[in-house]
Amino acid sequence: MKKKIISTFACVFILAGWQTAQAQSKPLEKVRLTVPAKALTFVPYYFGKAQGIFAKEGIDLEIIVMRPPLGVTALLAGDLEYTAAGGLSFRAALKGAPLRTITFIQTRLSFSLVGQPGMTPARIHNVAVSGIGSLAHYAAITVMKRLGNEKVTYISTNTTANSYTALLAKSVDAAIVTPPYTSMAILAGYPDFGNTFDVRDLQGGLVARLQYLHERREQARAMIRATLRSMESIVKNEVEAVAYLQRGFALEPKIAADTYRILKQIVNTDGDIEEPVLKTILEKLKQESGVTAEVPLDRLVDLSLLREVKAEVGKK
């Protein structure tokens, strides 16, 4: 009798082990996400992929670098599942495109104004920005206004990397940059004239087609869950995050550590955004786009999935 009981328990454990192995061997679902550049704004996706956070949610995340207009076009065509190009997606949705932002990974602008050694705010005559009319341009105007010097010329360089290069080449008096260029410049002795970490705007999110959200609701929940867990892990695990910045973005230890200090201030671990802030951003975009008609927020965002996930994991 005793041998039969032992044999029965052995069978149960073998069956349980087989079921676990089967669950673990279930193939991951390929999910494609476009980002405008391999930039630190989108580090939650890169870090989460490297740390296996997305894989734990059953997602084989493929991150594709693609210019925002192409990324949004591919998304609308159904050629991929998500884009992180929040700003352009918002503008497209504003004009009627069936896109919805479902999570915000950054709602504080990560720009800093860095000047030439020995430069003072009053002596700044020109500032390098990645593009006229861009968030970088808006951030530069904001900082210069705070410094009391609005009589400056803004020079478009196409990319933040080019703005940083222009600063090093002494082609400009100052440049508006984001991490890691902020830390690279400041640690090299360039003066920091201020930042926009307190300015609320859209600088990264998770966007999907409306039809996809209706058809693949559970998959979208898994994507949101992984994104939130990745952001939380970045903030709570400094050693791992700094090590990843060195490895994944080829940053020197001191630059990685200082970059992490900035990231910790701007990563939106909640994934959400306050309605008044969202309305202010919407009004700004309407003015820029020449839209005068009333636009409901639910034409641009669908945060119901995010809030379901947060309730599920006990986030408040």
Q: Model-flagged regions — what are they?
A:
Residues 80-85, 262-278, 308-315:
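Short amphipathic alpha-helical segments at helix boundaries and their inter-helical linkers
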Residues 23-166, 173-179, 192-200:
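Short, glycine-/small- and polar/acidic-enriched structural segments
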